[in-house]
Regions:
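Alpha-helix N-cap/helix-start capping motif
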Residues: 24-25, 247
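Short active-site oxyanion
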Residues: 15-19, 106
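Broad gene-expression machinery/nucleic-acid interaction feature
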Residues: 16, 39, 125, 146-148, ...
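Structured helix-beta-strand junction loops
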Residues: 14-15, 76
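Active-site loop/helix belt of alpha/beta enzymes
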Residues: 25-39, 44-159
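Conserved beta-strand segments that form the floor/walls of ligand-binding pockets within enzyme
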Residues: 11, 41-43, 72, 179, ...
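Single conserved hydrophobic/aromatic residue that forms the stacking wall/gate
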Residues: 1-7, 11-12
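C-terminal accessory subdomain/extension
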Residues: 156-253
């Protein structure tokens, strides 16, 4: 989680953190407290307009900026998840222009999606986050995340029997139901009630009824036996697929 340098001085000092300077106030504060003990990174705003110094702020304060003991110049791409978006090149070109002020400094503009845009976006350092765990859709990346959900109980229900809070699911036939130890308090979104799935290997097992705080009920009638656990993901259903079913993005998941 990003923190402001101003107000976090003790944390930076005690944990020997290299702060990222995003504005002139932080630059002055860094020089006042850490100039002799720490190095810093400088973030440039190349178009996302979220954090960092824009072109005017940079060139209007070169005296203070060039006096900083910097070890990295960085920026962040707004549209890196869209390979065809021309804004990626626009930001990269502006980044290169601004970095001419720091010719020998290490540079970084690519986070996870940015690493897939090509070598010209890699510079001296890339900053993969979610990409380390396979959370972005790319056939060349291995997905290493798995969550195993224990089966607590299983039972058989007959046709027209109902399941879960407010009986939002009615059985259309005799079926075997498993109750598993995971609910919305554990991060399984309620939006998946009656339409999500867990997995036995590659076999999907539909979620039936409402997902409750710590429990979820699943149809396992089609499985060869009673499993000890089911999985959140499968080789054909990864974090990005799960996120789409939750109507969100893999970073939030």
């Amino acid at each position: 989680m990003p923190i402001s340098l101003v107000g976090s001085e003790m944390c930076i000092r005690d944990s020997n953190i290299t702060p990222v300077i995003n504005n002139i106030l932080e630059a002055y504060k860094f020089i006042e407290i850490f100039r002799k003990t720490h190095s810093a990174a400088l973030q440039l705003n190349t178009g996302m307009n979220r954090l960092g110094l824009n072109k005017q702020a940079l060139f209007g304060n070169l005296d203070i900026i060039t006096s900083l003991p910097l070890n990295l110049i960085l920026s962040h791409l707004a549209c890196a998840d869209d390979i065809s978006n021309k804004e990626n090149i626009t930001q990269k070109d502006l980044f290169i222009e601004l970095c001419k002020t720091f010719p020998k400094m290490r540079k970084s503009i690519a986070a996870s999606h940015g690493t897939l845009l090509g070598n010209e976006f890699h510079f001296d350092m890339v900053r993969p986050g979610i990409g380390l765990y396979g959370g972005i859709k790319n056939s060349e990346l291995l997905n290493i995340i798995q969550i195993k959900v224990p089966v607590l109980q299983h039972f058989i229900i007959d046709k027209n029997m109902q399941v879960g809070y407010n009986f939002t699911y009615k059985a259309k036939h005799r079926m075997t139901v498993a109750t598993l130890s995971m609910g919305y308090a554990d991060g399984l979104p309620r939006i998946l009630s009656n339409k999500g799935k867990l997995f036995y290997g590659k076999i999907p097992c539909p979620i039936i009824g409402r997902i409750s705080m710590y429990l979820v009920t699943v149809d396992i009638s089609h499985l060869p036996g009673i499993p000890e656990y089911l999985c959140m993901f499968s080789p054909d259903y990864q974090v990005d697929d799960f996120a789409k079913d939750c109507k969100t993005i893999s970073h939030e998941v």
